[in-house]
């Protein structure tokens, strides 16, 4: 079996060696650029780890695994455009380096390339894999729409937020786990348990992102802390702060949310102090651990020896306790 680091190395090598021979090059240069920016490559790594539970040649499914990374980066490219974000992983975003029209066209082409790469899977499983990938892509769009709609609401409930991040983030990790298992000819029950494992891990990962945006170390996290607070993004932290705050705390939160002219550091400090007094930091940690515990139940139900599952569990544990 491969370690997660060995798999990550294979993924990066495969992506770095991808060629784009079609023209115009101006359409494909932004695609190469986006995929060259690195990242954690969680989705292809999970797919290959899932496959490797059952078979020892995960390098044979690098194309469909990297299809997920292509798709994920397509969503980031369009997210950056919608958010007018200037940087991604410390580098200029596509719409800044080129322009908005290029970001749209190159992003659309990445979506097509993702399906082309996924279609290179074993023909025996092509129909099932493409059906799952298509449904997942639609769910992610639904999650993004909910996310945008939540920006105009101060009454978002925790369960609504969890469903939004399940759609926007979690289902792609679940899809990665399931496709890996399908391509490895895993038993149907194991396939479904691995999907649920990925779903629960995805929820934990997203809540960890919410938490780190407030409480992470900026030197390790890779970006300034408090970005979500500054732009009033509806996160697990903010939603539960509104839901749990007393009248005084709620009034203070509303003041900062409605304030248009403010000092960034002052707002981040004030809202973080409110989070601390309300206790949403502890709530987030408890919820992250809950989803990880749920994920462990599903992986425990997979009918394989524990030593066969050890690398996948260790990888998930490292990601859960990451500081970036």
Model regions: which residues?
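All-alpha prenyltransferase/terpene-synthase fold signal
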Residues: 1-324
